[in-house]
Amino acid sequence: MSVFGGIVMLRVNNLSIHMAFMGVMAFALMAVSPAQARSGEEIMQEANAVMGFFPSAVAEVNLTTGKGNKKRERLLRLVSKQGDGRRQLIATFREPASVRGVGFSTELDVATDKRQSWVYLPSLGRVRELKGGQQHESFFGSDFSYSDLMGRDAAQDTHKLVGEDAVYFNITSTPKNSADIYSKLDYKVAKSDNTIREITFYNRKGQALKRLTNIDFEKVDGVPVLLNSVMENLKSGSVTSLNRTSMQVAIELFDYDFGPEALQ
């Protein structure tokens, strides 16, 4: 479920940063009869269709990261695309000058859950590939990891409906890849439009690590799209918030717009 689709410009407060955001945009609604019982797998497949409806998009987002009064601001350009079993993302800092040109790109093969990621530091003048656990480290000091920035695909996990109320389905998802950094994820999926409203991430010890709350949505071409979200580190109390100010969808993008060459 991508928190981010398309090109995104982010203005960030207190970031050592999305993403997720980017990734984080919400998408197409599938109508389901209230009387029809659905499994956890079906609910998450429908949520995946909503949160990943648009194959690409362009947005501007204000992003704030930090704790208390210690906050910084960043302008970040995000480009994402999905289709044919692949998800691609590129993120480049534009402001302030101290981080201008710093970039990150990642590509995920959904079927194999294989990911390649790279970072570009202008001060070094070269692209560096992120290996193994480096992809799960903090995205430039934010409360998102590099892998969080793109978001997850429903096919990466198994899903169980563990409860519901008048407003939400409660889903527990377990990664299929035993090497995944998370042991499980708890979702709240809105019954009204199949959007994901909350995700709690658990570490390998089963401890709640952080929580993503998707606060506001708006309709774009009749589809609910994320406006505001907050990622909270439940250990440190640090918070990263993302507030979108504009967006374009269905932007034509190509493979050469992503990857290590596109970062330079």
Annotated model-derived regions:
Residues V32-A37:
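Sec/Tat signal peptide C-region and signal peptidase I cleavage site
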Residues S39-P122:
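N-terminal mature ectodomain segment of secretory-pathway/periplasmic proteins
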Residues K81-R87, L161-N170, V220-D221:
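Short, ordered beta-strand-loop transition motifs
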Residues M1-L15:
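N-terminal secretory signal peptides that target proteins for export/translocation
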Residues H18-A31:
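Bacterial N-terminal signal peptides
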Residues E41, R72-E73, L149-K160, G206-R211:
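A short, amphipathic edge element
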Residues L263-Q264:
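Short, solvent-exposed mixed-charge patches
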Residues R94, S105, Q116-Y120, R126-K131, ...:
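Gly/Pro-enriched, hydrophobic low-complexity segments
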